Regions:
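Asp-based, Mg2+/Mn2+-dependent phosphohydrolase catalytic module
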Residues: 2-15, 115-118, 127, 131-132, ...
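Active-site neighborhood of HAD-like aspartate-dependent phosphohydrolases
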Residues: 6-55
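Alpha-helical elements of Rossmann-like donor-binding domains used by nucleotide-donor carbohydrate transfer enzymes
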Residues: 33-34, 49, 76-80, 96, ...
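A metal-dependent, Asp-based hydrolase signature
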Residues: 44, 58-95
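Short, acidic loop-to-helix structural element flanking the phosphoryl-transfer center
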Residues: 71-72, 89-126, 133-136, 164
Length: 232
């Protein structure tokens, strides 16, 4: 946990935890292994460009009121990222990488942390940009789905995070004030968006990235999902 963290005795234990999925519970860059097999020397570049373009597109369609489902945005982002890198991605290769996205690797500490929260009687959910079908498949593949309820998708609002309508799904589903819910994300922009909305927040800064400069910070910053347990 970061040195500037708010002391534990100044934060009431949250009544529920909502996790982001992509990048937080699941490693979005694990697709780079398959990409590297297909395009030796360029797999990691493709994985990172793909993720960046996916986030860019989610913001663009939200700002413009032109919603497209996350599965389609993910495919769109893959196509343009491969083209930008001059990689010969054919239809079969595209389908292979998209299938890989359905089966992203979970971070190794996840299950133990979720089980520890369940043992404490904490309700555990997710709030994700992913489509409902995407989330069902990928959380099953990761072996986590039986530990998670509710599974909240922004598809219900047709607005991607950081739109307030997306974050409103949590309090509505859980019957709690946003401040009573711990929102956990490995994306600083997502943690900040949730903080603006009123959640108690934890940014999982796995990459030791600098804090965004937006006049606000997440409640706490950690480096592993295990840091969630310090709230309880």
């Amino acid at each position: 946990m970061d040195a500037n963290a708010i002391p534990a005795d100044r934060i009431a234990p949250p009544k529920a935890v909502l996790f982001d999925v992509y990048g937080t519970l699941l490693d979005v860059y694990s697709v780079g292994l398959r990409a590297e097999q297909m395009f030796p020397g360029a797999g990691e570049h493709l994985a990172r460009a793909w993720r960046d373009k996916q986030i860019e597109y989610s913001r663009l369609v939200s700002m413009s009121g032109r919603y497209r489902p996350f599965w389609q945005l993910t495919r769109d982002a893959l196509q343009v990222s491969a083209a930008a890198l001059r990689l010969p991605l054919d239809a079969a290769g595209e389908d292979s990488l998209m299938n890989e996205y359905r089966h992203l690797s979970a971070f190794p500490e996840n299950r133990a942390v979720l089980l520890a929260l369940a043992d404490r009687g904490v309700r555990i959910g997710v709030l994700s940009n992913g489509d409902p079908d995407m989330l069902d498949v990928t959380l099953r593949s990761a072996g986590l789905i039986e530990l998670i309820d509710p599974i909240l998708s922004v598809h219900a609002t047709r607005r991607y995070k950081t739109d307030p309508a997306a974050y409103a799904l949590g309090p509505q589903a859980l019957g709690l004030a946003a401040s009573e819910i711990l929102f956990v994300s490995s994306n600083c922009w997502d943690a900040i968006g949730a903080t603006w909305y009123g959640y108690t927040t934890l940014w999982i800064n796995r990459a030791d990235a600098p804090m965004e400069r937006l006049g606000i910070q997440p409640t706490r910053v950690g480096h592993s999902l295990r840091d969630v347990l310090e709230f309880f």
